[in-house]
Every structure is written in C-alpha cells, then in structure tokens.
Amino acid sequence: MSLKVPKANNLQLFKDGYKHLSGLEDAVLRNIQAVSELSDLVRTSFGPNGRNKLLINHLGKLFVTSDAATIIREVEVVHPAAKLLVMASQAQEVEMGDATNTVIILAGELLKKAEHLLIMGLHPSEITRGYELACKKGLEELEKLSKSSLPTPLTQDSLATALKPAIASKQYGFEDTLSSLVAEAALAVMPPNPKNFNVDNVRVVKIMGGSLAGSRVVRGMVFGREPEGMIKKVNKAKVAVFTCALDIAQTETKGTVLIHNKEEMLNFTAGEEKHLEKVRPVVCSLAPEMLRTMQIFQEIADSGVKVVIAGSTVGELALHFLNRLGIAVLKVLSKFDLRRLCRVVNATPLARVGAPTAEEAGYVDVFESIEIGGDRVTVVRQLVESDEGFDPTDKSAEKTRTATIVLRGATSNLLDDLERAVDDGVNVIKALLKDGRLVPGAGATELELAKRVDVYGSGLKGLSQHAVRRWATALEVVPRTLAENALGGSEGNEVVSRLWAKHEQDGGEVFGVDVEAESDGTLSAVDHKILDSLAAKSWAIRLATEAAVSVLSVDSIIMSKPAGGPKIPQQAGNWDDDD
C-alpha cells in the first residue's frame, strides 16, 4: 500500500501573488462553469425569435442587439477559458460571417455533457478522444446531407433565397427586404469570376428617418454629405485625391518683427513688392498667401482636374478659388473610405497640395449630389454596361464596381443592427460563392447528425463511445434552443420530441423547427426554402469541438500577480478605427 507524502509547507515555487489552481474540482470543472455561463448568456439570443441584449460598453455606448459577435465583443470577457470560446466564435465570424452563436452554444453544451462524464469518473483524455472521433464522423455525414447548391448563373432571387435564413436570425420580419437589398448590391459588384467577390465593394450608409421600406441600393460610393463648394454635379472628370489640408500653411510661431529704423521697414516689404511686380496686374492687389494659393489651384485646374477629394479640412480661401475655377470639392474624413474611393477612381492619394501627374490623377464617370429622404448625399460612380452613356471603348480608367446600400430607420440603434445584418449577409454570399452547397436549416441538419453519430457511437468499443454519444446528444441543443426561444420551454420540448419521431421516418432528415408554429411546430426546411451553408455548419461544428477539447485539456491554471500601479484606462481610439 502506497502512502502519500505531504508537501513541505515552506516550498516556494512561484513568486508572491501567484495563483495556482489544479485538479478536477478547481481547474476543469471551474472552467466548464465559466464557459457554461457565457453559453447561457447568448443562448437566449439564438435564432429568429432570439431576445435582444441591451449593452453599455466601457465608453458608455449603447447597443441593442441579438448578434452574438457584437455581444461577446462588447462584454469584455476576462476568464481565460471563456476567452477560448470567444476566439473560436471570432474565427467563425472572420471565416464565414454567420453561425457565431452556434459555435458558442454548441461548445458550451459539449462541455456540460463532458462535466457529467468527468464526475462519473472518465478521464479527460477519453472524452477528448471521443469528441474528436465524433466530430470527424459528423463532418463526414454532413457532406451527405447536402440537398441543393447555389444555382448558376446567379440571379437576385436565388441569392436572396439563400440569404434569408442568415438574415432572419438577426432581423426577423425584415429578412425579405434586407436579403433583396444585399442580393441586388452583390450582383451589381459581381466580378466575372464570382470566387473573386470582394465584400469591401458593398458599402452601407445609414440615414436617420423613414422606415426600412425606404432603403435602396445605389451603384457607386455614397457619402452622407454634400459637396463643400457650389459645384454639385460633374460628368467624366479627372479626380485628384489629397490626404492633407487644402489651406494656407501657417507656422505656429508668432509673426512679430522688431524694426529699428526706416531702412529696415523699407527692406521688409521690398521682397513682396518685387514678387508682386512679376505677376499679372489682375492679381497684384492680392496678399502673397492668397496669390500662392491661387497659383496652386490654377495649376490643378490646368491639369484637367474637375473633382477634388479632400481627406482633411478645406480652407475658405481654397474653397473660394476652387469654386471660381469650377472644381467640385468633397471632404472625406474616413481614411478607410478615402482608400476605397482611391480604388474606385483609380487615383493615388497625395500628401501635398499641387497638380497631380497623369499617373496620380483618377477618373470618374459621374459625380453628383442627390437627395434621399430629405438628406443630401454625394454619389461617386463609374458607368457599367447597362447604364446610359456607357462607352465600351473608353479606357481612361480602370473600372472598379462599387455598390452602396442606403439604410433608413427611425433610431440609430436600429440602423446599427440593420448594418450588422447586412454585413453578415454579404459575408454569407462570399462563403456561398466559394462553396455553394446547402443543407436543411431550422435545426434539421443538427438533429439528423445527432441521430447518425449516436448510431456510430453505439457500435464503438471502449470508454470513448460514451463521449461520442454525448457529442451527438449535444447537437440537439440547436433545435431545442430554436424551439424554446420561439415557443417556450415546455412546448419546445414537445416539438423536439416530434422532430425525433419524424427523423426516424424515411425522408425525415429535412424536418426542422417551425418558429411560427403553424401546425405542430415542425416543417420541411427544404419545402420552405430554409437552407444553410454547408461550409458554415462545418466550420461551426469543427471550431466548437476544438474549443471544447482545448478547455478539457487544461488541468492547471497559473495566474501571475497583476502589475502594480493604477490600471491604465482603456482608450477610446480613433472614431474611424472600427470601420
């Protein structure tokens, strides 16, 4: 019989202030508890009937949203185990733009099931091995569940149909309008090879007032302000983009001059007088600064430039001369929008005020100010084949297609949430263009995978079969959450029971949750065209399993003492950094 040798009380391994947690109770189960709390937080926001969360971040900004990616980004999770789930959901957001909530609630459910196995006495390595086997089998079966794919050639109706489930989970009731807007904008910028679709070419402009029905798609870049000068419309013009201020350069030092005698006073103005004698009599009365400014903008006008884009301030004197020379001026303060605009007009941003060279100047077909819902906006766009006046022989500039979705809404919070739904929809299009396979939605795919993986686990030998079957049971959380959020807890359980009965029948793999409860709470996802991206499902299952395995692999937590001194407050950063 072996005896346990007690540790010496004076054994000092770490510096003072370190925390060391190890063992099943202190490390593993505590991590699972933290992850479960995060999972329960966003679970009620899952699906079309998910509840909104009202968040106020450290800067006092208000968010009202059911978007899981926004929720976990603004709550600032600090627990190390929960951060693993946050990173997994962020990877899903970057890769697919959809199913971020699925990653969190599925990983949380996997760890809840693992907790029961750990308490029963299974070793974490057996559970992780079983989860990895189940994930591999589940992804193999997922490939077999594909019922259709994105049709070619692409049409607005086919794209809108594929987008509706993803947008309905964010803005239920508005999915028809939003999916149509996103599909129209995506088709307007679709390159000849759809796999090269760039999500950055679809922009969003939010204009307060009206309703979502007043939203529209404008081909080109739209800026929520009108031009600075009197010139409001220019066609087929050269464009100059400046990142510096269009103003007279002035030093910060004082311009005080000490004059001792009359000779010094005469010499002080002699240089300016000689300079003025060389210029035309018309401008002899101008001050030297005004003269230099006029000469600079005259050079810009002589180079053929008719549109000037300013990335900083525009001085009154500069604006006066630009108006006299018939040059339109637009101020764009966002460095991201300035970069996109340079790509659209094929221009090089200049850090100095002066006439651009032929290589630095851009070209735009239409620069105009229009009215949308009582607000004046500026549109910069290139003509395409379907536009009147398009010249296929005109090679004056490389044409870059851009479309802007102009959203209307009553409040800024609603507009922000609509913008997040549009961004998700555009990312879903990008994912579907790479892999167009579709699987039944409404929880049908997860329930069918649960059934098939459970059968697979029953045939395994060894302790891993328990983890495989628990993995299959965890997939049931998706249809169960959809039903509970839509119909309530007790009714949700009955719907899941009916779904299990239908999935045991031939052809039952297409049945999912009916969130509108028209009959018994179930429906055929294929008949109702509720289809999800196979690639998004695959990534969500893989990332959720990897996150759960990572948490289960931890047996010890070591935390150092925080650095001394007052904590530095988090800075707000530039207003343009989150674009």
Positions of predicted regions on the chain:
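A short glycine/serine-rich beta->alpha loop
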Residues: 22-25, 69-75, 89-99, 125, ...
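Extended, low-charge hydrophobic alpha-helical regions
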Residues: 29, 76-78, 401-579
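Short, hydrophobic/aliphatic alpha-helical segments
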Residues: 30-42, 78-95, 279-283, 295-296, ...
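Short hydrophobic alpha-helical segments that form membrane-spanning helices or hydrophobic packing faces
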Residues: 54-57, 103-107, 341, 447-452, ...
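Hydrophobic or amphipathic alpha-helical targeting/insertion segments
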Residues: 110-154
